[in-house]
A protein has these predicted regions:
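Intrinsically disordered, low-complexity Pro/Gly-rich regions
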Residues: 1, 299-338
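Cytoplasmic membrane-interface segments at the C-terminal ends of transmembrane helices
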Residues: 1-10, 68-88, 132-163, 218-241, ...
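Alpha-helical membrane-associated segments of multi-pass integral membrane proteins
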Residues: 111-135, 161-168, 266-291
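Membrane interfacial helix motifs at helix-loop boundaries and amphipathic/re-entrant anchors
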Residues: 25-63, 97-123, 177-215, 251-279
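Hydrophobic alpha-helical transmembrane segments of polytopic
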Residues: 11-21, 57-60, 64, 84, ...
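Hydrophobic, ordered structural segments
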Residues: 77, 81-143
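Alpha-helical transmembrane segments of multi-pass integral membrane proteins
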Residues: 14-28, 91-96, 125-133, 158-184, ...
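C-terminal functional regions that serve as terminal interaction/effector modules
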Residues: 16-19, 232-235, 241-304
């Protein structure tokens, strides 16, 4: 099966629109802050920010901007365009879905002007609708190849698949372990607040940490299992999950360098040490997985299955062609006297 041209155009337009919306919110925050670098440290979770109006974006917005931009630019000629659109839609749903209840909740009263909250809520509805259309387009936009040169989905190479499985599988295990830890430490009620965002100070378009970590676990786990079985969707989905890990790990590394946490690593508490080590592992694993999965995939050979050539009756030999068995091929013309 191939991905039709109409579906590719639809996906490219939707991704471009999503990238434009995210870029507009980022530009809005940059214009409201005194210094652009202050917005970066706000994204990294380093305290308050001097701004005429509270920031709306979070660290996930530049990640979304990068994903939507890359997919919009490559979907027209990519062999895994359908999987890329599905992965972009899934990431957008995972990040923006909490806005439906966070922006209209009572605990957000007083954190931002009502008109700003209304604009953010309407924007969230539009973005979620576009994400759903992306997923539907990815699932319904397949067609039958019209030529032997049509772009068909490719699978990750064996070495790439093993690398992605190990890195993303380990990241999923680490992030899941942290959520188990916080669930036991906080108790059920407080942990549910961590998932819904009720007890968390975050920007209007932010994602509750418990919800975000659960999304990272699911994305990494799905990509890791898909890579293990060599499925075409594992490459785009793995790159999306790796982009999340790289973004979070990059912010953690910047914070650690700013406050010299690496130099005084031994002075940190055990939880702080493990948290920093986990985020730095996510940075390394995400970067390596991105580079590995960005390599061109392998196309399926015609008539070949997972364990070699397909079973069945061999094609009859034609005179003048090489044979498939032992011995020399038949001569191109009969010898004299035949």
């Amino acid at each position: 099966m191939i991905f039709t041209r109409g579906a590719r155009i639809t996906g490219a337009v939707l991704c471009a629109a999503l990238a434009a919306v995210t870029a507009a919110w980022i530009v809005r925050d940059l214009l409201e802050t005194e210094r652009p670098v202050d917005l970066w440290w706000f994204w990294a979770g380093q305290g308050e920010i001097r701004a005429a109006s509270p920031p709306v974006t979070s660290l996930l917005d530049p990640v979304l901007l990068a994903v939507h931009t890359v997919v919009a630019l490559t979907v027209m000629r990519s062999a895994v365009a359908a999987s890329a659109l599905f992965a972009a839609g899934a990431l957008t749903l995972a990040v923006r879905l909490p806005g439906l209840w966070v922006l209209g909740s009572s605990w957000m009263d007083g954190r931002a002007p009502d008109d700003l909250r209304t604009r953010a809520l309407l924007c969230s509805f539009g973005v979620l609708a576009a994400a759903v259309v992306l997923i539907v387009t990815a699932l319904a936009g397949r067609g039958v190849p019209d030529s032997a040169y049509a772009l068909t989905p490719t699978r990750p190479a064996q070495g790439v698949a093993v690398t992605a499985f190990l890195l993303l599988g380990a990241a999923a295990g680490i992030w899941a372990a942290w959520e188990v830890y916080w669930g036991q430490r906080l108790g059920l009620d407080a942990y549910l607040d961590r998932v819904t965002g009720e007890s968390v100070l975050m920007p209007l378009l932010g994602t509750p940490p418990g919800w975000l970590n659960a999304a990272i676990v699911l994305l990494c786990l799905a990509a890791a299992v898909g890579a293990l079985f060599g499925t075409p969707f594992s490459r785009p989905l793995g790159m999306v999950a790796a982009a999340l890990l790289t973004g979070l790990g990059g912010a953690a590394l910047a914070t650690a360098l700013r406050y010299e946490q690496l130099d005084r690593f031994g002075e940190l508490t055990t939880v702080e040490q493990l948290s920093l080590a986990s985020l730095l592992f996510g940075l390394g694993a995400g970067t390596l997985a991105l580079f590995a999965l960005a390599r061109r995939g392998e196309a399926d050979m015609p008539g070949a299955g997972a364990h070699g050539p397909a079973w069945g009756r061999p094609e009859p030999q034609r005179y003048g062609q090489g044979g498939g068995g032992f011995g020399p091929p038949p001569p191109s013309s009969p010898p004299p006297g035949w």
